[in-house]
Swiss-Prot record:
Top EC class, one word: transferase
Main location per the UniProt record: cytoplasm
NCBIfam families: PRK02135.1
GO MF entries: S-adenosylmethionine-dependent methyltransferase activity; tRNA methyltransferase activity
GO biological process: tRNA methylation
Family to which this protein belongs: Belongs to the methyltransferase superfamily. TrmY family.
InterPro entries the record matches: Alpha/beta_knot_MTases (IPR029028), TrmY (IPR007158), tRNA_m1G_MTases_N (IPR029026)
Entry binding sites for S-adenosyl-L-methionine: L132, C186
GO cellular component, one term: cytoplasm
Protein name as annotated: Putative pseudouridine methyltransferase
Documented EC number(s): 2.1.1.-
Length: 198
């Protein structure tokens, strides 16, 4: 099972604000692009992939939206607007939730009021964590664990205070090349690297 976590520090948890932020400073469209490239392939979708989108611009609790490729029903169309609407629907469902609650949105999609830090602690029990870092080990030199979990961010870098807690959880730093890429591009390269090893 491959897992991907996208930490979206500027993304609002209010569904209307989320949709209004597309193409603006928060760049919420990044989440749809990343989701598209993580789960879908030509004419189909990947098996055994889980994507966690952690939206952090909130007055109360972060929202973690989980997409499980094996459980997804008919998504309704392979385009940005449809995927942003799925995210917005999850945010609407999450309205009024207390801390660390879980709600099902539809088949294969859930939303939780859980922080990035708490989510990563949970995932570290079942996955080997990998974080993209320009000083990390080149991806072709990594021997990946059977259950890899890749940590990415939107256009706002991972805060320095997160590095120590990630280090304590055994997170390995990997490098995809000399250029800084969008999260949506990174997931394609990661999938390709893992696919070539099958």
């Amino acid at each position: 099972m491959r897992a991907f976590v996208v930490r979206a520090r500027a993304a609002p948890v209010d569904s209307q604000q989320f949709l209004a932020a597309i193409g603006h400073e928060a760049h919420t469209e990044i989440l749809a692009h990343t989701l598209m490239n993580t789960i879908f392939v030509a004419q189909s979708h990947r098996d055994d992939v889980v994507v966690y989108l952690v939206l952090e611009s909130t007055q109360d609790f972060s929202r973690t939206i989980c997409f499980r490729s094996n459980e997804l029903g008919h998504i309704g169309g392979f385009h940005e607007q449809n995927l942003t609407n799925k995210i917005a629907k999850a945010l609407t469902v999450s309205k009024g939730m207390a801390k660390e609650q879980l709600r099902e949105v539809e088949a294969g999609i859930t939303v939780r009021t859980v922080s990035f830090e708490k989510l990563i602690q949970e995932l570290a029990e079942d996955y080997q964590l990998y974080m993209l870092e320009k000083k990390g080990t080149p991806v072709r030199d990594i021997e990946f664990a059977a259950n890899p979990c890749f940590l990415l961010t939107d256009h706002i870098p991972m805060p320095k205070k997160s590095f120590n807690s990630l280090k304590r959880l055994g997170t390995q730093h990997i490098n995809l090349g000399p250029k800084m890429l969008f999260a949506s591009q990174c997931v394609v390269l990661i999938h390709n690297e893992l696919d070539m090893r099958l």
